[in-house]
Amino acid sequence: MAVQKNRKTRSKRGMRRSHDALGTATMSVDSTSGETHVRHHVTADGYYKGKKVLSL
């Protein structure tokens, strides 16, 4: 099992974690229903790119 020789400082730990944050999801407005949804995902009422793809 790997064990570190020297303890990592708070600074080095923070530098490593600096890339772990999640960005906000980009939202789009559907052209047909005007509903806000996550990009590249079907809306709640079944529309994608202005076309009905799911019958709910």
UniProtKB/Swiss-Prot annotation:
Pfam families: Ribosomal_L32p. Residues 25-35 have a biased composition (Polar residues). GO terms for biological process: translation. InterPro entries: Ribosomal_bL32 (IPR002677), Ribosomal_bL32_bact (IPR044957), Ribosomal_zn-bd (IPR011332). Residues 1-16 have a biased composition (Basic residues). Keywords: Ribonucleoprotein, Ribosomal protein. Belongs to the bacterial ribosomal protein bL32 family. NCBIfam families: rpmF_bact (TIGR01031). HAMAP family: Ribosomal_bL32 (MF_00340). This is Large ribosomal subunit protein bL32. It comes from Pseudoalteromonas atlantica (strain T6c / ATCC BAA-1087).
